[in-house]
A protein has these predicted regions:
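Compositionally biased linear targeting/interaction segments
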Residues: 1-261
Length: 261
């Protein structure tokens, strides 16, 4: 159980354990002859689907293109996500509403409300399992998106490099530089980010922040002796105090993860 969340230096404290990083670093341990791995990820560094607007949609569009999706398909996906969660039945230029979904072999209506889980994207026009979860050749969207509300934009102290690289004005070189420098010193203000990205800051500043997080996703995998294929569970928890937390998402099994030798 997480005892308390510490954002400084991207760390959290687990009960009975030392401080750990909350950037997806994989930790290992042993129970008798069996093994386990776990990692903790700060949700504030992901792109919040429920906070997506016509303006910030450019970030997911850039992310999709960077992941190998064709630009026209990315346009369809972004507009369709916005249509899926807005309250009306008017579709955007490349989007879809209930008239499209009701024409499918297994018809359903557009939700026209906030998303409850990232997996819900599989119901949105243009999204395929490969785009969402990735493949052996390509990364997917799943680990880069969230549905949990917060303020302050994408937290640049916690954002994966793929998310950083999708920000307007950000280049792969700048994303690598931000990712490297924040390991030694977290950014406390957007001016700190500006000292790294320079004149690109005004382009990305409407979409980012440095606010602390209280929501984390924990993925843990257990392995029997000499077996490489483990059993994985995943949970997203909101830390409400030093002794209280609330689970907002749980999945078991949560996909296969092979033990690294």
């Amino acid at each position: 159980i997480m005892r308390r969340g510490l954002y400084k230096n991207k760390q959290a404290v687990m009960e009975g354990s030392e401080a750990i990083k909350v950037d997806g670093t994989i930790y290992t341990g042993q129970l008798g002859n069996d093994y386990y791995t776990f990692d903790v990820v700060d949700e504030s560094g992901k792109i919040n689907l429920n906070a997506l607007t016509d303006g910030s949609g450019v970030i997911i569009n850039n992310l999709l293109v960077n992941l190998g999706v064709k630009k026209e398909d990315a346009d369809t996906i972004v507009d369709s996500i916005l249509d899926w969660k807005d309250a009306d039945e008017f579709h955007r230029l490349h989007g879809a509403e209930s008239d499209y979904y009701m024409s499918l072999p297994n018809p359903y209506k557009s939700k026209n409300a906030r998303l409850d889980a990232v997996e819900e994207l599989l119901m949105v026009k243009g999204i395929t399992p490969e785009i969402l979860y990735g493949s052996n050749e390509k990364a997917g969207l799943f680990d880069l998106l969230t549905v949990y509300a917060r303020t302050g934009g994408i937290n640049v102290n916690a954002a994966p490099k793929e998310v950083l690289a999708a920000l307007p004005g950000m280049t792969p070189e700048l994303a690598n530089k931000v990712s490297s420098l924040r390991e030694s010193a977290e950014m406390k203000t957007l001016e700190d980010l500006g000292s790294i990205v320079g004149m690109s800051l005004p382009l990305m500043s409407p979409y980012v922040g440095v606010s602390e997080s209280n929501t984390y996703t924990i993925k843990a995998t257990g392995y029997k002796k000499n077996e490489k294929q483990g059993f994985t569970i995943m949970a997203t928890v909101v830390i409400e105090s030093n002794s209280k937390y609330r689970c907002v998402y749980y999945k078991s099994p949560a996909g296969a993860r092979q033990r690294q030798e």
